[in-house]
A protein has these predicted regions:
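Conserved, well-structured core segments
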Residues: 294-296
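Long, low-complexity, intrinsically disordered segments
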Residues: 300-315
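Acidic catalytic motifs of isoprenoid enzymes
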Residues: 1-169, 173-189, 196, 200-236, ...
Length: 315
């Protein structure tokens, strides 16, 4: 996917880093088993977070073993054994990658289009394996959602909120797939907020290039100013506020995940929410400049940790 949903490694504890690496590498191995070895090339931080959230929702236990892999043949690494949560994320990743490549073939030019055309047959094979494994309804849902999103983007609607919500709804349905009741509702909320945040941040990240090559960008349609080839400082501040608001909504959803007996999983999710994602906002909107997102995230994390400790003490 996009690679924005990542940890900030310097702030992870050693055991949290090991847990995260086990899930990341375990997802990679599961993708190879479920959708073919080529699918491992589409491994992303984004679906690693999806896997972590699914583990929190389902309460699945991880079995971690030290293994070698093709990418790291000399040294064994902690690697989670396949679980239903990892398998679901493997299939969802393959299906979404297929429609993302189709989107690139339609919209991109030059080397990006050539690259998409080269990988398209392999990605299509991954998607077919997912359908054969019983995920045809997921495939149909992604197809319809992406079709609706493409039609909305083609209309060049002067809004970032509507396409962001459509993408968020898609992510929510993927994350909630197969769940019921409160778990499904919570998964959908987490996916919705993550999807909206990713869509808005990606639009900001691609703004200058999209304007240069006259590609669709929801922010360019919203601002409707052909002379604005780059986001102005004022627009960047507006986007920062909007993205932090999405993180605040996501915080409320993360707070409902039952991770009381899994401190490593809790610590990783907290790190991504309060350290990793704010730093992605800083990187995309302000480059190396300091905008206060990371400091604000750290402050919210300290408040979150205090609230959690009180809750655990009373539990």
């Amino acid at each position: 996917m996009y690679g924005y949903l990542r940890t900030h490694a310097p702030e992870l504890k050693v055991r949290e880093q090991e847990y995260y690496r086990a899930v990341y590498c375990g997802l990679c191995r599961t993708m190879g088993k479920c959708t073919g070895q080529c699918s491992r090339m589409t491994l992303s931080y984004d679906f690693t977070l999806f896997a972590l959230v699914r583990l929190a929702l389902t309460g699945e236990d991880l079995t971690v073993k030290s293994r070698r892999c093709v990418a790291h043949p000399l040294r064994k690494r902690p690697m989670a054994e396949p679980t239903p949560a990892l398998a679901l994320c493997a299939y969802a990743s393959a299906i979404l990658a297929h429609y993302k490549v189709k989107d690139d073939l339609r919209d991109e030019r030059g080397l990006k289009r050539t690259a998409a055309s080269v990988v398209a047959p392999f990605i299509a094979s991954m998607r077919r394996r997912s359908v054969r494994k019983g995920y045809g309804d997921m495939d149909s849902g992604v197809y319809l959602a992406m079709k609706e999103l493409c039609e909305l983007e083609a209309s060049r609607i002067p809004s970032v909120d509507e396409p962001a919500t459509l993408f968020g709804e898609l992510m929510g349905k993927l994350l909630a797939y197969g769940l019921e009741g409160n778990e499904a509702k919570l998964a959908h909320t987490v996916g919705l907020r993550l999807g909206r945040w990713v869509y808005i941040l990606d639009a900001a990240d691609d703004y200058a290039e999209d304007v240069k090559y006259r590609r669709y960008n929801p922010l360019a349609c919203l601002y409707a100013d052909p002379s604005m080839t780059e986001l102005t400082p004022h627009k960047r501040e507006e986007l920062k506020i909007a993205l932090l608001a999405e993180l605040a909504e996501l915080e409320c959803a993360f707070d409902l995940l039952d991770t009381a007996d899994r401190p490593d999983l809790r610590g990783i999710l907290s790190n991504i929410l309060y350290e990793g994602m704010p730093r992605q906002i800083e990187r995309v909107l302000f480059g190396d400049g300091e905008c206060g997102c990371a400091r604000e995230g750290q402050g919210r994390k300290r408040h979150y940790d205090r609230r959690r400790r009180k809750g655990d003490d009373h539990g």
